[in-house]
Amino acid sequence: MKAEILCVGTELLLGDIVNTNAQYISKELANIGIEVYHHSVIGDNENRLLKELERAFNYCDLVITTGGLGPTKDDLTKESVAKFFQEDLVLHEKSLKQIEKRLLCFNKSMTESNKKQAYFPKNCEILENPNGTAPGFIIEKDNKIAIILPGPPYEMQPMFEKKVMPYLEKLTNCTIKSKVLRITGIGESDVADLISDILESQTNPTVAPYAKQGETTLRITAKANSEEKALNLIVPIEKKIRQILEDNIYGSGETSLEEVIANILVKRNLTIATAESCTGGLLAGKLINFPGISSVFLEGAITYSNESKINRLNVKKETLEKYTAVSKEVALEMAEGIAKSSGTNIGISTTGVAGPGGGTYDKPIGLVYIGLYINGKTFVKELNYSGNRQFIRNITVTRALDFLRRNLK
């Protein structure tokens, strides 16, 4: 089967939004043996979209579109696809009720514009969207298949995984199962180097690394004629990867780093408090994402100024004067100070130069220290990163969580 991915949206052409959808879909299709022959990006224009569909179906069996399913007048993907397949748009009552219910969650009422999102080609399979107001759909006609998906990745990806992949698996006459391993502490290129033998010799299962800020995921995907056989194919490859990467793997599936840490803290009844400077509360914010953390997370303090470090955390004035706020000595005193003043087993701190100003030759932008206090023992980690302010702050949080995880083992 040959496929084209067609991403719709003037905002993509203008560069206002990065097109991550095509990359995601291409990787998923490759895992099930569907060849992607072409990527296209076009603006919100019906005539252009019709021409692109005509061109794509000249050599492809399958076209997947993203975007253009919103409530505004320039969202024209659905109308264009219906016209291409010579289908009338009809109101789908179930979708209308689901859209109305979702709008009520945000204290919004149904409008005529939103009602437009409940119209679909008469002969199609509708794909529910629990994460937004734009359902997708699949239409088959004259040996042509079009899969129409919403543009926002947080809506498109769950729909693709839960609805589209099972549909495509039936077309390819095999069962596909995947397992995701979550890795932090080493980058994607390091992961690829360490498991290069596996990546170079892979056939079935396939192993695909994906990178995001501070983390790498490995998706192991196996194909077989039954679910049991597919899962059994994954087991030896996963075992081999775990032996190589060891504790750089922090979890699997949908598990987050903060969830892993929270489970350790709750299970061992270890209380924690945070003292943050350069991350400004982001670290505490990550930890409290876990719903059961309230029993062990006692306090989060943002101590940005030297005065607050002295008054709130009992950091010594002499330490600040001798080493400056961005130093391992201050990071350690911050961690110990928050733990002792809060009465917790663990204190963790961040201090650094996030930029864009404030850097010096000795203390450049991207220099960060993470301090850790665990039941009387102290640990410190130095980081050096390049990037903008938000990147440095976010990567510091990920590294701080990983530093804590490794020292809790």
From Swiss-Prot:
SMART domains: MoCF_biosynth. InterPro entries: CinA, CinA-like_C, CinA_C, CinA_KH, Competence-induced_CinA, MoaB/Mog-like_dom_sf, MoaB/Mog_dom. Belongs to the CinA family. This is Putative competence-damage inducible protein. It comes from Clostridium botulinum (strain Langeland / NCTC 10281 / Type F). Pfam families: CinA (PF02464), CinA_KH (PF18146), MoCF_biosynth (PF00994).
